[in-house]
From Swiss-Prot:
Protein known as: Myosin-9
Positions of post-translational Phosphoserine modification: S628, S1114, S1714, S1943
Organism: Canis lupus familiaris (Dog)
GO biological process: actin cytoskeleton organization; actin filament-based movement; angiogenesis; blood vessel endothelial cell migration; cell adhesion; cortical granule exocytosis; cytokinetic process; membrane protein ectodomain proteolysis
Region (Actin-binding): 654-676
Positions of ATP binding: G174, E175, S176, G177, A178, G179, K180, T181
Region spans: Mediates interaction with LIMCH1: 2-838
Modified residues (N6-succinyllysine): K850, K1669
Subunit structure: Myosin is a hexameric protein that consists of 2 heavy chain subunits (MHC), 2 alkali light chain subunits (MLC) and 2 regulatory light chain subunits (MLC-2). Interacts with RASIP1. Interacts with DDR1. Interacts with PDLIM2. Interacts with SVIL. Interacts with HTRA3. Interacts with Myo7a. Interacts with CFAP95. Interacts with LIMCH1; independently of the integration of MYH9 into the myosin complex. Interacts with RAB3A. Interacts with ZBED4. Interacts with S100A4; this interaction increases cell motility.
Subcellular location(s) of the protein: Cytoplasm, Cytoskeleton; Cytoplasm, Cell cortex; Cytoplasmic vesicle, Secretory vesicle, Cortical granule
Boundaries of every Myosin N-terminal SH3-like domain copy: 27-77
PTM remark: ISGylated. Ubiquitination.
Family membership: Belongs to the TRAFAC class myosin-kinesin ATPase superfamily. Myosin family.
Amino acid sequence: MAQQAADKYLYVDKNFINNPLAQADWAAKKLVWVPSDKSGFEPASLKEEVGEEAIVELVENGKKVKVNKDDIQKMNPPKFSKVEDMAELTCLNEASVLHNLKEXYYSGLIYTYSGLFCVVINPYKNLPIYSEEIVEMYKGKKRHEMPPHIYAITDTAYRSMMQDREDQSILCTGESGAGKTENTKKVIQYLAHVASSHKSKKDQGELERQLLQANPILEAFGNAKTVKNDNSSRFGKFIRINFDVNGYIVGANIETYLLEKSRAIRQAKEERTFHIFYYLLSGAGEHLKTDLLLEPYNKYRFLSNGHVTIPGQQDKDMFQETMEAMRIMGIPEEEQMGLLRVISGVLQLGNIVFKKERNTDQASMPDNTAAQKVSHLLGINVTDFTRGILTPRIKVGRDYVQKAQTKEQADFAIEALAKATYERMFRWLVLRINKALDKTKRQGASFIGILDIAGFEIFDLNSFEQLCINYTNEKLQQLFNHTMFILEQEEYQREGIEWNFIDFGLDLQPCIDLIEKPAGPPGILALLDEECWFPKATDKSFVEKVVQEQGTHPKFQKPKQLKDKADFCIIHYAGKVDYKADEWLMKNMDPLNDNIATLLHQSSDKFVSELWKDVDRIIGLDQVAGMSETALPGAFKTRKGMFRTVGQLYKEQLAKLMATLRNTNPNFVRCIIPNHEKKAGKLDPHLVLDQLRCNGVLEGIRICRQGFPNRVVFQEFRQRYEILTPNSIPKGFMDGKQACVLMIKALELDSNLYRIGQSKVFFRAGVLAHLEEERDLKITDVIIGFQACCRGYLARKAFAKRQQQLTAMKVLQRNCAAYLKLRNWQWWRLFTKVKPLLQVSRQEEEMMAKEEELVKVREKQLAAENRLTEMETLQSQLMAEKLQLQEQLQAETELCAEAEELRARLTAKKQELEEICHDLEARVEEEEERCQHLQAEKKKMQQNIQELEEQLEEEESARQKLQLEKVTTEAKLKKLEEDQIIMEDQNCKLAKEKKLLEDRIAEFTTNLMEEEEKSKSLAKLKNKHEAMITDLEERLRREEKQRQELEKTRRKLEGDSTDLNDQIAELQAQIAELKMQLAKKEEELQAALARVEEEATQKNMALKKIRELESQISELQEDLESERASRNKAEKQKRDLGEELEALKTELEDTLDSTAAQQELRSKREQEVNILKKTLEEEARTHEAQIQEMRQKHSQAVEELAEQLEQTKRVKANLEKAKQTLENERGELANEVKVLQQGKGDSEHKRKKAEAQLQELQVKFTEGERVRTELADKVTKLQVELDNVMGLLTQSDSKSSKLTKDFSALESQLQDTQELLQEENRQKLSLSTKLKQMEDEKNSFKEQLEEEEEAKRNLEKQIATLHAQVTDMKKKMEDGVGCLETAEEAKRKLQKDLEGLGQRYEEKVAAYDKLEKTKTRLQQELDDLLVDLDHQRRTASNLEKKQKKFDQLLAEEKTISAKYAEERDRAEAEAREKETKALSLARALEEAMEQKAELERLNKQFRTEMEDLMSSKDDVGKSVHELEKSKRALEQQVEEMKTQLEELEDELQATEDAKLRLEVNLQAMKAQFERDLQGRDEQSEEKKKQLVRQVREMEAELEDEKKQRSMAVAARKKLEMDLKDLEAHIDSANKNRDEAIKQLRKLQAQMKDCVRELDDTRASREEILAQAKENEKKMKSMEAEMIQLQEELAAAERAKRQAQQERDELADEIANSSGKGALALEEKRRLEARIAQLEEELEEEQGNTELVNDRLKKANLQIDQINTDLNLERSHAQKNENARQQLERQNKELKVKLQEMEGTVKSKYKASITALEAKIAQLEEQLDNETKERQAACKQVRRAEKKLKDVLLQVDDERRNAEQFKDQADKASTRLKQLKRQLEEAEEEAQRANASRRKLQRELEDATETADAMNREVSSLKNKLRRGDLPFVVPRRVARKGAGDCSDEEVDGKADGAEAKAAE
């Protein structure tokens, strides 16, 4: 019953179609179609034609109406009603197509073929045509075998993917509500059933289940109820289902496009938001509601219309289904709960209410319960959330400020947050589904893509979302038109088929350009993006700009009245659409509150934080607010580069999708909406007609009918249909094309039904299906014949078996009858009893011998069985190995094919890379030198940093020492106040110097700001250049399209050069691919350039800061040189410690040597291990750890040495403290220390900054190193893959070497074709040069176009000025009223004239429309007539075929009759032979009967005689017994003869019956042949007449074609003249370009010279600075020596004073003690001696002081000289600095000049300069990469060499294994040979046994013959006995005596003979 119900909605009712009454009515009434307002078209009968009008009678009401002839359309015969393929209609027009679709729709047939695609009308009800049984019905069937269905389309796509190995796509297109989503689901259902790896119906695979469950999840979250559709997809999706080589599903991937996220916050009237919101609120349990804080429907603001229900759907049940689908998809419960929390959070966001405060515009949140719920659900802090919305932190300059938000801003922020949250959740869900669907490890070979995207939408007012959706549908419709109409016809021309290009007028490119064109003039999306950049831009300004730029576009319209709400209109292919541009700028930028975004990123809920992980890519509201304040594009820059608008992202996504679809074979399904009321069984004809016109259905049918939609490659055609032409192709090699020509000749196809191209055979619609049917019939015939042979063979076998059984039965019967006769005979019984006794002894011996033989035989049998089992096991092993080898071979072949492809790609890549390498090798050396120079500078900087660190450490120690001394010096500060005043003066001087330095720093900062402004201006220029590049690319594309059109026209004319055009198209495709690659590379290059610029600026900043630090450090060094005197004394201790340090270093080097040795050992071990990478990495890590440990030890030792140094310094300080003479100087030093401490604090601050910058540089360096390592890893992986590929290549090479032998025979045939190819290549080269010239010309045209555009702008400006002048003149004209009146009269006259002209124009337009209609009608009629003509030709060709087939049949029948005659003659001859045999057998039988009668008579005589003998004598018993035996034998012979006679009689009867049958059949066949011959003769005469008519018609057509060709030749000549003019233009443009390039090269050379001069000045400056530093160091050392000398002089002066004091004291004592006595004389002498001694000492000290003074003077002189030198060096440095500044100024001036030059050149040559700059940057970047990669490559080469050694070792091992296997195989073969020999010996023994058996049989036969001879003797004796009595006695006695003398052996022998006789 279910099947019958389904058939009703699938198959057409044949009784309705074949109604003869309807056919007669149609023919009688001349029915036609007439336009109708109600039903589109209605039937009417044509009554009368009057001029251009016709009178028709409407069928419905019988009214007569006058109609224009052009409006009448022909009606098809009733047999074409509800036709499955509308391409079969005889009259193809809108009315017929609409009627066919309507009839089928009302009958429940929703699917109809329309040529190559399928049309589906939404039934708005469930139909029983999608069950598993229906799927099985369509599985593997051809399209024409089953009625139209979505399953049929899917199955053809699947089968063509499997056969052609080409990716497929199924595009379901149509308006919203047409049924695209449902058909997509059915496609997935069919594929999941057909391509499932689990073949049982009950057990479906997990992947297939998940694939089927992906749609319900996506529908729940992405679909919604709209006015047109209850389950409208509010996003687009492209489902890619991947299949493996066997056709099983291995995975899937879903890509989504443009989710309508605004539906989450507001909906139109009677519409719903996304289904999941209603599912959750209806289906959630109480526990879940409390957890998710759910409320009733009317409590949510975001549910605009409350609870809107969908008829026939329960939201509660759908919730359970969605949750079950997520469970099947493998989404865990935690993630499910996370999704539901986010949904509830989105709803709660709508409930947050803001109010405006009284006095200010600031927003406030009076009730924060909703905010608390939101923060609870999303895991964030409430206060932070409310603060982030009401008073977010906004960046102003470099600071962050909290800005209060207005109510409108807060509401916008909440809505934006809700939309973004839902969109991110949806994107996460799609990624999660893709992860689940793509988890299989099997490799996907090809895929089927299913596109389900939002249909065309036309509302009252349409927004940005509708523009994107309609733009997508325009692109898809353009793809359909391109594939159906343009690519189809281009393929005809490529293949060299005679074809006139038909322009169907369905090009949608103008509308697409209006939306997407980037420049010249820019499209709507480009203008929207541009407006987003401008400050104070509004939606109104955007609309004004659109009207200004695109106001004159044919597809663009302004609103006609001011009352219209729409801002502008676009004429799409589906109709005119009004757009309202409210909030388009915001929608395009899609801004967010970045405070809330960061808060959500830091959420405690893992799911929410995962959704908001890419916070750094969003556009903040502060950036959008900045639009009104700043004009800089930098305001829109995020952390990772410039932001991308929604329009840009969607455009890129769409371009990617279109590229994917173009690379597949598309299968179109056109979905049609029958009505807007969503009612079943209702069809609005006007709505359907509009959709048919838009979708290009009629044009698709027309090209399908006129063109050749079916095409087959030569080889495939030969392989598939050679069975239909078995003997047409000769044996041996033949070209595919020649073979196809011969096959088509043999098939006798009409020449109009096919065309033979260069590589394919093209057929009209239906021809291939007919061939397929014939092929199926042929195959069935072959299989029937094969079955008949098999059945005959089996029957013969069974018959032979039955015959054997019959003969066996007869033998058994005979033996049984003989046994029954002998059973009751007494002698037999005695014989049976005696015989075993006699044979016992003999049997025992025989048994012994037999047992021995049996034992031997059994042993042999066991041995043979063992051998057999061994052989079987060996065979099974060999079979298994064979299977394994076959599998490996198959895998290897597949791998080989893949490797071939890979090899081709790699070779192409290799060639490209080699070219790039050759280009870059010249610059590598320069870059290496530059790198070395930079490394040297880096080393210098590191050395400077180390020196600074050491000085800082010394400062630290000095500071500690001074702090200790500070306590002792505080008491003496009062004495040093005068010195303090001096120091204050010095401080003032230092302050002045500090101010000077600060001024210099300010100058540097201003320079830095200027540089930043320059960088910004450069960024602006870069953006402009990028925009210009995009414009030029768009123009290039447009020019390419124009060039393609020119080439198409040229292809029409140049029919002979089709092959060359094919190759040009291929080259263009390659160029397009290269351009795409170039664009990608340029994008990467620009990104890299941006990074390089940033790094360069950072580097310059760092260098500037380092220079400042160096200058400050040099100043500090001058102050610190005074402390170095104390350090010189500690140098000895330091040397000792240095020796210890060197010892430690030697120890460290020893340890390093040991580690190196360990590493070598490890590397040797690693060679033996298979996985080299892991072990190497582990060893590297351990090695690094050891190095770090050694470094730590080294640093510890250094620290210990530093501590010891510090201790020595402290000792030295304590010793110096003892010197009291230095107290005055210490005070001075204390003051200096204060200054130094301040300076040191500043230096430490700067040092920290420098260290931070250094760390940043190191981080960048580490990042670069990481990138390099990643690249190295990739290179290693590629190297491994290359090695694998090389291994596979070697295998493939070995195979190819085998194949070369086969190809050698073909090479001779290929030489001729190669010569032709060379000629074609030459022509191609010439064409390619022409093509290049055309491209150059195109570029020049572009430049001219730009100049013209500039001129146009200038003219527009002039026009504006003129308009202003006109307005002024109008004001003046207002004074003259009289003039106005005359002007008004003139105006009225002009208006009247204009009205008259308008009327005339309208009349002309109407006439033109009429002419167009007549033209279209006539064209359609012409097409119909052509179709009829084709049909008639086909019928004629079919009749000719039938005639030829009839002739063939007749010939076959004649041959069959001849065969039958021969068979009859043979049968008659056999019958005669059998008759003669029968007669001879009858004679033989008569003779046998006679013999039998004689034998019976003799038998009777013998019986009587026996009785007599028995009665008379007992002695003769034995002889009587023998006679009875002979009698029985004779009786048996007689019976055998009888049976033979009966058999012969049966055979004779059978032959007679067969003879009669043959005669009857022959007579019947003769009569049938005569009748058929008469009928065929009549048909052939009629066909000949028809053919003559057709030939005449064809001749007329041929003449028309000749005329057209002559016209085409004239047009071709004109085009060639135009081409020459264009070439002249190209030459001039090339000259201009060369001049520009020369100027550019000159500028570049000047730039290089400037750069070199700058480098020289820098080097000289650095040398001067180094000399100045050295001089300063010398001066400081001299100053230190001078101070030391001054200290020594002071000490000497003190000693001198002490000595003088002592002398004075002694003199006083002498004077006082002069009056004492002689006792004091001795004391006096002693004292005088002491004085003399002291005087000597004083003289010595004076000499010393003089020497010291001399030295001091010398030191002062040296200091003065050093100061003069220093001043000279400073003046030199100043001069150099001035020179540098002057050079920088010159450089700036040159840069300005260069920019001016570039500005002048850019107007003409922008594209070339940008390309060159991009190439330079790209090459520099590539050079850096190459240097890095070269270093990595060296390492990889070493690794690869090691691997190669390992591989060689493995190869040697495998060779040994192979040799072992060969030895084993040889042993097995020898063993097999031995077994064979043993078998042969056994067979010989069997033959010997058979020979012995035969010998025994011969002996037995001899014995029987002797027995017969004895019987004969007995019979002769009997005869003699009968003759007389006397002689009878003697023999009787003799016989008695003989009987007495007879031995037992003779008796036994006689008995044996009798037994043998009986056995016979």
